Amino acid sequence: MTSLISVKNLSKSFPGVKALDQVHFDLRAGEVHALMGENGAGKSTLMKILAGVYRKDSGEMLLDGQPVEIESPAHAQSLAIGIVHQELHLMNHLTAAQNIYLGREPRHCGGLFLDEARLNQDTQILFDRLNLALAPTTAIGELTVARQQMVEIAKALSFKSRVLIMDEPTAALNNAEIDELFRIIRQLKSEGVGIVYISHKMDEIQRIADRITVMRDGSTIGTVPASTPMQQVIAMMVGRNLEQAEKHIPDTSANEVLLEVRGLNRGRVIRDVNFSVRRGEILGFAGLMGAGRTEVARAVFGADPIDSGEVRVRGELIRLASPQDAVQAGIGYLSEDRKHFGLATGMDVESNITLPSLKRWLKWGLFLNQPAIHHISQQMVGKLRIKTPSLTQTARLLSGGNQQKVVVAKWLVQDCDVLIFDEPTRGIDVGAKSEIYKLLNELATQGKAIIVISSELPEVLLLSHRVLVMCEGRITGEVAGDVATQETLMALATRRESLASTVH
């Protein structure tokens, strides 16, 4: 079968870094070709070359079997190559139609006036093609992330794209929205569109992809059918067989209760929530998107106000007027959006680790004890196995897994005994996930009380000693970690009455 697009021996270097080294890749018409690899494997660089953002240094690119040089994003669009970025490029104050045809709006009267009727009509044709029930005149700011993504796909198709690159398209979608996206992808496949699908999510790739190409350290490791066992694909990605963590659930029933939450309420998003976590325990929170898990975490951390309820740390009632009160009591929170909450991406590693604790190193209230700051930072980098060239490395240049570890280090320096992890591995590759899992278990072994909120049920099952399930702001069930299954958790996640028994 002739490839829509193929690359052979493609190489690309940046100052001091060889990003791509003799890469091979091809995409056929009417297939979903998944591209997998750890962060830094070269996936994004390859896609940016195909999309015209970067120019290759050497190698060959073929479009419909003919050599081609892609000189710019506009040139890529003219060649029917479209890309849907993970971070959407839409303007909230404009309508869906205006976003799709921005800069190339249909006009009449010799180009003097915008032909708004045709603009909306052309957009409606695109939406009809996708079976998308959406008015072209809807402002982007009024749409969910999932709907905005559909608009991005329609925008790419407005250039008559035959090659569509999708970068982590389900990162912010719930299960129903993922099903809708997959329906559209299958429809585009049936029309002969070739789709490059970049994702870390193994289960999704097996559902939607036809083939998988694995990259590592800037090179192509191989291309295999999507039916290939995932352990084999993971081994290709990381260059080794990942150790399957053997789940051991310790008996923490006699341990001190570090965190106790009673009668927590906030409107309809948190409704009479009760739970406790003991020293050395990992408590998982499962539920569908919008169930209230993050809202509970933010309330316990003092980030959002509550209507009623109490929070106790080591038996002592604490007043939560702000996150500072929670931190002072020994509660640390790792947000699901670490780049906006929790990590100062423009600052270096050392500053991120020590900034909240600087008062500890003030001499006479005036001078910072810089050697002590450097020592504790170096200690944390070693303890958490943070991969960074130096303490002065800017945090945004670290991989997702190492950024997460820097945030953990910050709370450990603060001596927090209760650590709340909200989506701890979101956007993190499979090798780094394994490191984060190992770290969470080590922290529990050291006597920390850990709360893990995750939308990935296999992750909840792998980590949790106990699992609480939420639906519509209530806790609808508690399941012991050694008997929990995806089926039992999903049943509880769709159950609307609250848990009758007291949660211990």
From Swiss-Prot:
It holds the Pfam family ABC_tran. PROSITE patterns: ABC_TRANSPORTER_1, ABC_TRANSPORTER_2, MGLA, RBSA. ATP binds at residues 37-44. It is an enzyme of class 7 (translocase). The keyword Nucleotide-binding applies. SMART domains: AAA. It catalyses: D-ribose(out) + ATP + H2O = D-ribose(in) + ADP + phosphate + H(+); D-galactose(out) + ATP + H2O = D-galactose(in) + ADP + phosphate + H(+). GO terms for molecular function: ABC-type D-ribose transporter activity; ATP binding; ATP hydrolysis activity. Keywords: ATP-binding, Cell inner membrane, Cell membrane, Membrane, Nucleotide-binding, Repeat, Sugar transport, Translocase, Transport. It is found in: Cell inner membrane. Belongs to the ABC transporter superfamily. Carbohydrate importer 2 (CUT2) (TC 3.A.1.2) family. PANTHER family: CARBOHYDRATE TRANSPORT ATP-BINDING PROTEIN MG119-RELATED, D-ALLOSE IMPORT ATP-BINDING PROTEIN ALSA-RELATED. This is Putative ribose/galactose/methyl galactoside import ATP-binding protein. It comes from Albidiferax ferrireducens (strain ATCC BAA-621 / DSM 15236 / T118).
